[in-house]
Amino acid sequence: MGVGPWFYVENAILDNFKYKGQPHNIEMKVALANSGDVQIELIQQTNDVPSMYQDFLNSGREGFQHIAYWTEDYDAMYQHLQDKGYDVVHEGQIGGPQGRMAYFDSEHAVGIAIEISELAGSKKQIFDYIKKASIGWNGSKPIRKL
């Protein structure tokens, strides 16, 4: 398939997580890999706080839950989606204050949730590292801890 290597985080920390405006402490395991310019995320929420991940599973679905758009102009994209009528359902930060992300309620319009992800700071460095590791990957060490 040309996907790999996978980078695994046992306890991904999502700071300032909010679901429908209410703060919660979400716990997750995450694996990331690239196939060319496309990053694939495998996310397993390990507690039962409310989130769009829980909403998706509780509705009886599984599989492809969201598509992410990376941006270096997070505030403008956030405002653009709100101006288009999409509501933020959950949001938080990963990798510090420049690692903001938000999931918008877009399932009625496009069939899946839209995530915007700020591509800056340590998160950008990690995403670049994962992409670079995928270029010419020979299949060795398919699972690596981040």
What annotation goes with each model-predicted range?
Residues M1-F7, Q22-G85, D105-L146:
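Glyoxalase I/VOC metalloenzyme domain signal
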Residues F7-V9, E91-G92:
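Conserved S-adenosyl-L-methionine
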Residues N11-K18, K84-V88:
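Short Pro/Gly-enriched beta-strand edge/turn motifs at strand-loop
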Residues A12-I13, G95, K123:
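Residue-level detector of flexible, active-site-proximal loop/helix-junction positions
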Residues K20-P23, G92:
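Short linear motifs in intrinsically disordered
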Residues G96-R100:
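Short acidic/glycine-enriched loop/turn segments that link adjacent beta-strands
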